[in-house]
Amino acid sequence: MIRSEKEFDYIKIKLASPMRILQWSHRKLPNGQFVGEVQKSETINYRTFKPEMDGLFCERIFGPSKSLECACGKYKRVRYEGLICERCGVELTESRVRRHRMGHINLIYPVTHVWYTNSRPNYIALLLEVEQCEKRLDTGWTEFADLRDIKEKDNKDIPEYPSSEIECRNYLASPKAILNCKEFLKEKSKAKKSNIVNFYDERIKRIKLASLAYFIAEDEIAFYGLHWDLQQYRRCRELGFTGYPLKPHSKSRNRRRNTPKYLLRSTPNYLIGAVLIKRELEKLNLDQEIIKTRNFIMLCSKVLHKEQPFYNFSHWSRKWEYQRIYKLRDQSIKRIRILENLLTTGANPAWMIITILPVIPPALRPMIQLEGGRFATSDLNELYRRIITRNNRLLRLLEIDAPQLIIRNEKRMLQEAVDTLIDNGKRGKIALSASNRPLKSLSDIIKGKHGRFRQNLLGKRVDYSGRSVIVVGPSLKLNQCGLPYEMAIELFQPFIIRELINQGLASNMKVAKNLLQQNEPIINPVLEKVLANHPIFLNRAPTLHRLGIQAFQPIIVQGRAIKLHPLVCSAFNADFDGDQMAVHVPLSLEAQAECYMLMLAPYNFLSPANGEPIIMPSQDMVLGCYYLTVNNINGLLGSNHYFADLNDVILAYNQDQIEIHTSIWVRYKHKISKPSNFIKKIILNDKSYIEYYENIQIRKDENDQIIVQYLQTTTGRVLLNYIIQTTLNLKP
């Protein structure tokens, strides 16, 4: 089999057109027959345990289940590779093609993509400009409609207003319109603010895309009127009008039986639901819409920056109007981003409506036979089965000319089945299996910590790597880490085998592997020799900056946990409450040289973000130093004993003769600056004398020469001083 490896710089994810989906799955056989469409909901034949033809595991569509063997068994040899069986139509090739060959389902009725109709922001609603708010800046058209109502009710002498919308748009620019609007606001001054807010948003708010796609309406009039509303609104938007004709009010319950003929004529059956949304999306001219939206954003900005006066009426009206314009501008900014992305990627907005549904390869949704004749299958097979069943049932209902109510219900069920396949629970109700377990959809497979991206693409398992919990290793050096013995044997196995053969301890690789499996004592010195000159990488996810991966010199430790120096925790953003870290072994000489020259922990002392030290004692280390140097605790074992040097103190502490906080006197050989807080002076028989200070005792001879001097301290302070001197090589 010929494998082609193509180099690429990046991967671009965008909307797939129906023709592209067909290219993924559509194939032509030598006999002229096209395959690729999944027409049956069956998976396998439960008598022969073979995939059903044209089903979800069809060998003719996705490839053979067994390599180089057709479904009917006529051809079973390597010499027939590439041949297509004339009896069953199966191509003789490797079975691994079932991991990438796709199929498709021709949907009888188009459905909307749930990611674009039930998302925030709602992409389709933004493109069609029906996103919860009235899409116009001038409110005069609606106000004039109310003025007529006022005139009819109160019989006031209000001048006549233009009847057509084009005349109205010209009329709005005149000073007369501003005067009449002021009169109107005086009439409405007694009205509540909430009523006016609802009045402004009422007409567009009732156009709900979910109601269109899922056929949700209280009666026939509301159902057809909803689609009529969208068509009229979109037609007026294309002409540049600021409003659209109002939908007739719904009738009372006793008059809702028959749908008016004029509504049926204005909204044909084939222009309802997702078909209508698809037609409106197809009619969008992206270039013109971008220009119109940019101009609208500029107009909103001028009004908000008071460059162009807009509202000269009451304070609360002006405040509310500015809030509405802010909302319109924000939605227009979101809309122009969507339009520019569609234009850049060359995608058509109508591709958000699915007419051809791709079927992923069967190896990615397997069916496994268990003991006892039962089968375990992926949830995707059940979701695909529902779609095919409902799609075929809708086709039969259309063929027999079933009532429209039944057909609409079946279309809604088909829409819900596709929604569940793409993202189960996105629209509210979660589809459950027979055991009341939520079915795993395509979105569930790719998202989250255990999804396809983070688990299999970003977090791939590689050779010469391991993972374990980290624990603190306070006795380690800064460039060291504790590596568990079992992990070291497994990671460095090839290096150990080579060293065993080079030293003559094993004659071949098989003997060396047997020595490793039997855990012979001879392995330990060989392992230490290998680790002496071989660093390792430690990585903690997420790797947010370059210090998330550092090199260390491994030290063999017992147990199964990786020991880490506490000072490097801040660079890894790690703590010891169950965090895990990954171990990687650099194989090439270049990688090992990079470890020693650039990536060792002592060489990463400063933070690359701000240049400040990132290796600093904190938390347990500060508390430990404080506890180690605490004094003024009386009545402890060995208090006020005298010691010749630091070694005597450490020896006494190791023999449990003194405690960590015991107050002791230690001889000090260096010169002490003139002490203060003199207490007393005692003269001895040999004419020498002892001067007592607060923390110092000095014995001098009769010539004032110092014989010996002692400092008062604690065992813990001696230990801290001894460690610092040893580390800095200051100890004599």
From Swiss-Prot:
<dbReference type="GO" id="GO:0009507">
    <property type="term" value="C:chloroplast"/>
</dbReference>
<dbReference type="InterPro" id="IPR044893">
    <property type="entry name" value="RNA_pol_Rpb1_clamp_domain"/>
</dbReference>
<keyword id="KW-0460">Magnesium</keyword>
<dbReference type="Pfam" id="PF04983">
    <property type="entry name" value="RNA_pol_Rpb1_3"/>
</dbReference>
<dbReference type="GO" id="GO:0006351">
    <property type="term" value="P:DNA-templated transcription"/>
</dbReference>
<dbReference type="Pfam" id="PF04997">
    <property type="entry name" value="RNA_pol_Rpb1_1"/>
</dbReference>
<feature type="binding site">
    <location>
        <position position="72"/>
    </location>
    <ligand>
        <name>Zn(2+)</name>
    </ligand>
</feature>
<feature type="binding site">
    <location>
        <position position="70"/>
    </location>
    <ligand>
        <name>Zn(2+)</name>
    </ligand>
</feature>
<comment type="function">
    <text>DNA-dependent RNA polymerase catalyzes the transcription of DNA into RNA using the four ribonucleoside triphosphates as substrates.</text>
</comment>
<keyword id="KW-0479">Metal-binding</keyword>
<dbReference type="GO" id="GO:0008270">
    <property type="term" value="F:zinc ion binding"/>
</dbReference>
<feature type="binding site">
    <location>
        <position position="577"/>
    </location>
    <ligand>
        <name>Mg(2+)</name>
    </ligand>
</feature>
<dbReference type="Pfam" id="PF00623">
    <property type="entry name" value="RNA_pol_Rpb1_2"/>
</dbReference>
<dbReference type="InterPro" id="IPR000722">
    <property type="entry name" value="RNA_pol_asu"/>
</dbReference>
<keyword id="KW-0808">Transferase</keyword>
<protein>
    <recommendedName>
        <fullName>DNA-directed RNA polymerase subunit beta'</fullName>
        <ecNumber>2.7.7.6</ecNumber>
    </recommendedName>
</protein>
<dbReference type="InterPro" id="IPR045867">
    <property type="entry name" value="DNA-dir_RpoC_beta_prime"/>
</dbReference>
<dbReference type="GO" id="GO:0005739">
    <property type="term" value="C:mitochondrion"/>
</dbReference>
<feature type="binding site">
    <location>
        <position position="575"/>
    </location>
    <ligand>
        <name>Mg(2+)</name>
    </ligand>
</feature>
<keyword id="KW-0934">Plastid</keyword>
<dbReference type="GO" id="GO:0000287">
    <property type="term" value="F:magnesium ion binding"/>
</dbReference>
<dbReference type="GO" id="GO:0000428">
    <property type="term" value="C:DNA-directed RNA polymerase complex"/>
</dbReference>
<dbReference type="InterPro" id="IPR006592">
    <property type="entry name" value="RNA_pol_N"/>
</dbReference>
<keyword id="KW-0150">Chloroplast</keyword>
<feature type="binding site">
    <location>
        <position position="88"/>
    </location>
    <ligand>
        <name>Zn(2+)</name>
    </ligand>
</feature>
<keyword id="KW-0804">Transcription</keyword>
<dbReference type="GO" id="GO:0003899">
    <property type="term" value="F:DNA-directed RNA polymerase activity"/>
</dbReference>
<dbReference type="InterPro" id="IPR042102">
    <property type="entry name" value="RNA_pol_Rpb1_3_sf"/>
</dbReference>
<feature type="binding site">
    <location>
        <position position="579"/>
    </location>
    <ligand>
        <name>Mg(2+)</name>
    </ligand>
</feature>
<keyword id="KW-0240">DNA-directed RNA polymerase</keyword>
<dbReference type="GO" id="GO:0003677">
    <property type="term" value="F:DNA binding"/>
</dbReference>
<keyword id="KW-0548">Nucleotidyltransferase</keyword>
<dbReference type="InterPro" id="IPR034678">
    <property type="entry name" value="RNApol_RpoC1"/>
</dbReference>
<dbReference type="InterPro" id="IPR007066">
    <property type="entry name" value="RNA_pol_Rpb1_3"/>
</dbReference>
<comment type="similarity">
    <text>Belongs to the RNA polymerase beta' chain family. RpoC1 subfamily.</text>
</comment>
<comment type="subunit">
    <text>In plastids the minimal PEP RNA polymerase catalytic core is composed of four subunits: alpha, beta, beta', and beta''. When a (nuclear-encoded) sigma factor is associated with the core the holoenzyme is formed, which can initiate transcription.</text>
</comment>
<keyword id="KW-0862">Zinc</keyword>
<feature type="binding site">
    <location>
        <position position="85"/>
    </location>
    <ligand>
        <name>Zn(2+)</name>
    </ligand>
</feature>
<dbReference type="InterPro" id="IPR007080">
    <property type="entry name" value="RNA_pol_Rpb1_1"/>
</dbReference>
